[in-house]
């Protein structure tokens, strides 16, 4: 990462300037990510599956002049030099033929770069660290600006939550994409905070490879999404008892509701703990989680993480706090809440009000402080004068024994 950081500074990278990463979960992503931060830059991580048009839009909006990408992406992305601020591509992997003079091989940079520690840049807690492309709390695409202190605070919050882990003795399986703040914080950052071995999974859909990685490296911490845990539960070789998954101790599930059936089946397979949490790009990345060793309540996203304050407010004005048990919009205050949306002052003002992050999610809180998501505020279905939430319909359909997944 020092080599990459020094290269960026030699090319005139300015503090706060964005640098793009268009990579899957690979060592080059991790090295590039921390190199950008060391140089005082801002990471603009992009999904490698994005089309050239999508990359063009984001590159133009963020103003990135340099993009790191895999060799197999080069041919379809390189033409964007003509229509975006991108001046140079750094290519990871073997290329057919030679690169143009304007571009550079990652391998060459790693072999020949300056490995001295960066001492010329002072990075502050309130400096921007990441641009996370997000649908936002309103559904309109925008870039959430995460600060260094946001990311550090969140990984320390979650370190306190994982009471069954030990410094220097864990292996974190990073199967969530690192180009999303979920993978960044609860994958990369958490592994480093724990002093853990980091196992990067570039394609979690390859269950044979994923299961082999769990066994080979004795993965103990495994953040993921409900679909991946459900897929493991029903994979033929798992059902046949061909895998030893007993190393797994702590799993955090996000991005969608975790069915209790999936949770119980996975815990029976591994004898570890699988808990549901909640977060969003605007508070990179987690704000709630069920206790890893304490009580997990069905349908709940759990309790607020340390340092997080939450309220449930009325949907119309967002100013009146709702009684316990009644649904309203979930608003959050905490050290991980973003700076705002890049060049979107109106959307920022709508989402951040008097220090509170308005999530756009409808939720309720029970008498013990556990929170339950109802649905997205904008997804309400009005039927016969009543409000019906898609999640309520999904919950009923999910009860059928032959239904594995459902979306309304």
Label for each model-derived stretch:
Residues 3-6, 10-11, 38-111:
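Structural core segment of the AMP-binding/adenylate-forming
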Residues 11-13, 17, 113-127, 131-174, ...:
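Conserved adenylate-forming
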Residues 23-24, 41-59, 71-76, 196-217, ...:
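ATP-dependent adenylate-forming carboxylate-activation enzymes
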Residues 50, 56-59, 67-69, 222, ...:
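AMP-binding/adenylate-forming catalytic core of the ANL superfamily
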Residues 152-171, 181-220, 231, 235:
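Conserved AMP-binding/adenylation subdomain of ANL enzymes
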Residues 196, 219-224, 233-297, 309, ...:
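Gly/Ser/Thr-rich phosphate-binding loop
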Residues 311-331, 350, 367-368:
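Conserved beta-loop-beta connector loops within the AMP-binding
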Residues 323-338, 356, 362-363:
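AMP-binding/adenylate-forming core of the ANL superfamily
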């Amino acid at each position: 990462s020092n080599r990459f950081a020094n290269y960026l500074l030699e090319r005139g990278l300015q503090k706060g300037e964005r640098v793009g990463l268009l990579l899957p979960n690979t060592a080059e992503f991790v090295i590039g990510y921390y190199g950008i931060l060391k140089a005082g830059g801002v990471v603009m991580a992009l999904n490698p599956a994005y089309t050239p048009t999508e990359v063009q839009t984001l590159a133009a909006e963020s103003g990135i002049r340099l993009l790191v990408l895999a060799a197999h992406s080069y041919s379809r992305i390189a033409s964007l030099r003509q229509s975006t601020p991108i001046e140079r591509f750094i290519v990871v992997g073997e290329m057919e033929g030679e690169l143009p003079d304007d571009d550079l091989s990652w391998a060459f940079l790693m072999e020949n770069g300056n490995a001295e520690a960066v001492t010329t840049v002072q990075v502050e807690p309130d400096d921007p660290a990441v641009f996370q492309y997000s649908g936002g709390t309103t559904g309109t695409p925008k870039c959430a600006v995460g600060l260094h202190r946001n990311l550090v605070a969140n990984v320390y919050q979650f370190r306190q939550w994982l009471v069954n882990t030990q410094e220097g003795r864990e292996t974190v399986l990073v199967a969530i994409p690192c180009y999303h703040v979920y993978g960044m914080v609860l994958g990369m950052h958490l592994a480093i905070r724990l002093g853990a071995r980091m196992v990067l999974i570039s394609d979690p859909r390859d269950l044979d490879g994923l299961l082999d990685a769990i066994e080979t490296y004795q993965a103990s911490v495994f953040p993921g999404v409900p679909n991946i845990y459900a897929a493991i539960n029903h994979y033929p070789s798992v059902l046949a008892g061909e895998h030893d998954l007993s190393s797994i101790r702590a799993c955090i599930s996000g991005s969608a509701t975790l069915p209790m059936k999936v949770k119980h089946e996975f815990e029976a397979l591994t004898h570890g703990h699988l808990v549901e949490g909640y977060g969003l790009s605007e508070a990179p990345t987690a704000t709630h989680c069920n206790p890893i060793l304490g009580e997990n309540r069905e349908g709940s996203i759990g309790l607020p993480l340390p340092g997080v304050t939450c309220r449930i407010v009325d949907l119309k004005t967002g100013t009146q706090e709702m009684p316990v048990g009644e649904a309203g919009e979930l608003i959050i205050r905490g050290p991980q809440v973003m700076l705002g949306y890049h060049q979107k002052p109106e959307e920022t003002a709508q989402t951040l009000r008097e220090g509170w992050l308005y999530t756009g999610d409808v939720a309720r809180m029970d008498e013990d402080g556990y929170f339950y998501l109802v649905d997205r505020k904008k997804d309400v279905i009005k039927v016969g004068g009543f409000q019906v939430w898609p999640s309520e319909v999904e919950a009923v359909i999910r009860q059928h024994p032959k239904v594995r997944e459902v979306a309304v």
